[in-house]
Amino acid sequence: DTFFFIFHEIRARENNYNNLLEQPNFFTLLPSLKNKIVLDIGCGIGDFAAYCINQGAKQVTGIDSSLNMITNAKKRHIHEGLLFEQVAFEDMRVLNGTIDFISSSLAFHYIADFQLLIKKISTALCEGGILLFSLEHPIVTANMGKESWITNEEGNLLHFAVDNYQDEGLRTQNWLVDHVIMYHRTMSTILNTLIENGLQIEKIIEPIPTEEALRNLPSLKKEFRRPS
């Protein structure tokens, strides 16, 4: 579909927000993956799942709701320890206490039932298991179809507007294609859902670009003015 091809084209570029901002911070939090059983939620085209195998993971399962993503992942990455499965995040099988490490990169804000998802994750993790995920900041997801960056007549950015923050629920945004559905939750809802399902929060990062990242992609300077 159109979304997949545009997404794939953007990710193929060396200098993109994912490579320069989100992923470097994500990777700093990775535990040792040697001999671990891994589940990657929202695996996309499977690159991170393959990375886990290369880092010594025993078995990695990648799930994604997009057939195009899963089909591409299976073509790109072939290994006896890799399994890719098309399944909606909310419908993933509960694997009681069998997973050492669960990862998810920028997918949780597309999931309608966050409480159910985290409950399943908590059940699936073994004792001492780790969940590492990234998602769009609630400051960014709050607005309901309004232009967030306010500009002057010359087009210069004045400030980032936040509205409807406490009004949780469905949002639509135009990202790559029109009317992409996502879900806004407050920071307290996100954190308390983790805590209430028995997970212990060890670290939170709100990424800022490095000097090198700014040289490669100057538009990243906006990230100093609001979380991403």
Listing of model-derived features with the role each one plays in the protein:
Residues 39-41, 45-91:
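Class I SAM-dependent methyltransferase SAM/SAH-binding core
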Residues 103:
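A conserved beta-strand element that flanks and buttresses the S-adenosyl-L-methionine
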Residues 1-33, 47, 51, 69-72, 131-169:
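Conserved class I S-adenosyl-L-methionine
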Residues 135, 139-143, 174-188:
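Acceptor-substrate binding/catalytic loop of class I
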Residues 106-109:
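Short catalytic micro-motifs in class I SAM-dependent methyltransferases
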Residues 115-130:
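A short glycine-rich, Lys/Arg-flanked "PGG" loop and its adjoining helix->strand segment in the class I
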Residues 170, 181-204:
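Short alpha-helix
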